[in-house]
Amino acid sequence: MALMSQAGSSHCIYSEKVRCISGHRSIINNMDMFRMREICFGVDISSRNASRRVQGNYLNHIGVGSRRGDLTIVAASPPTEDAVVAAEPLTKEDLVGYLASGCKSKEKWRIGTEHEKFGFEFGTLRPMKYDQIADLLNGIAERFDWEKVMEGDKIIGLKQGKQSISLEPGGQFELSGAPLETLHQTCAEVNSHLYQVKAVAEEMGIGFLGTGFQPKWGLKDIPIMPKGRYEIIRNYMPKVGSLGLDMMFRTCTVQVNLDFSSEADMIRKFRAGLALQPIATALFANSPFTEGKPNGYLSKRSHIWTDTDNNRAGMLPFVFDDSFGFEQYVDYALDVPMYFVYRKKKYVDCTGLSFRDFMNGKLPPIPGEYPTLNDWENHLTTIFPEVRLKRYLEMRGADGGPWRRLCALPAFWVGILYDEGSLQSVLDMTFDWTAEERDMLRNKVPKSGLKTPFRDGLLMHVAQDVVKLAKEGLERRGFKETGFLNEVAEVVKTGVTPAEKLLELYHGKWGQSVDPIFEELLY
């Protein structure tokens, strides 16, 4: 149901058709889980009893997995029903093995890009209501051959191959892309998606806005999507932070999901990703307005995460400990309070409860039941640090933005994390950064962007070196992908973030109105 209120003057939009090229579907074969574990840990564990148990549980319970390989979870889908009851409780080793199963050899590394966007009515600029979203999803499904994803009698998403379209709590429209080999394929996928969405949405008088935070409307104006898990989370958020509802209903992001070859490779990429995440936040800062006025931040979206739920967000300083590995991340995740479990096609409220208790069959709402690997995978998706580990690594620090930046964000991270030379240079560069310095950057960048003081200069100077490394990494990949960095190259050259350009327009050409942003950042 959409909650509506009277607000300022309307601003009509006349959009242009976006130039598009065909999307690209990529299908990759998953390596056998235990071959993966041998790659990850460098030992042959296939004969161990515990590993046989992992294999049994894994095959029985992994009805959903990650967007990687043959065992695929589609983001739009509710969890699968757990038809198979665990023969014996999961062990911590099983949970570690789940993460380790993501290891894959370099030739199988892929790029998975996700982005969210705000739908709005052209005539009023109001957010799309659920009924409009349902019509849009049905229209895309019928015209472009997507499979509908339902929760009860409500359409909540679409899937096609390894792509999915899903809804965030306030109706933010998300594309979770397929795992692809090159950035050219990634950008083609984005273009194909935007073409399909626009083809249906424009006939309905609907447009889409690429920014990190809803610039005009208050929480009371945002529709609530009919998804069971969101109701549980919405009721819990005010208990653990002051900005959680803003995060749910008024933010949009773009992120990239990248692979690792081994536990050691995961550690190196995790550390580089965390250290550089504030730079990505600055480069893509694009959320300076709240309810029609400047909000004092360049990335309001990033600031919101500092007071959403600090039990499940942040910079994870333990990743830089010498002892860090898959097991330590499992220990961390076990201590993150739960949100829910999915049983009998319903979400069971488990907010604030312990997954460790669940492992022991002592979860109060479902006493005597033990978790499956489905439950573990679902739990991992409710953890929101700046870099998140599942069976791949998610870079989570960037604001949503216009389509060129949807290609630039994966280009930035692929150039750094998928090239050994650039990755090592970043690790050398950030080796002596202290936890206090990383936290300082995390907390100050949302407000001051690239102008944040750092050591003897500004963060802009570090960012210039990092973007240079990303470009060199892309050049060495040999796919002629460096052009996708043009958007961020201009930002580091001038030190002016996208948000600062929007503020300049607001105080100048726009006459202190945010309404023109709906045309400026229209997809």
From Swiss-Prot:
Database matches in Pfam families: GCS2 (PF04107)
Disulfide topology: C187-C407
Post-translational modification: The Cys-187-Cys-407 disulfide bridge is known to modulate the enzyme activity according to the redox status. The oxidized form constitutes the active enzyme.
One of the protein's GO biological processes: glutathione biosynthetic process
Molecular function, one GO term: ATP binding
InterPro entries associated with the record: GCL_bact_plant, GCS2, Gln_synth/guanido_kin_cat_dom, Glut_cys_lig_pln_type
Catalysed transformations (reactions): L-cysteine + L-glutamate + ATP = gamma-L-glutamyl-L-cysteine + ADP + phosphate + H(+)
Principal cellular location given in the protein's record: plastid
E.C. number: 6.3.2.2
Recorded GO CC terms: chloroplast
Protein's UniProt name: Glutamate--cysteine ligase, chloroplastic
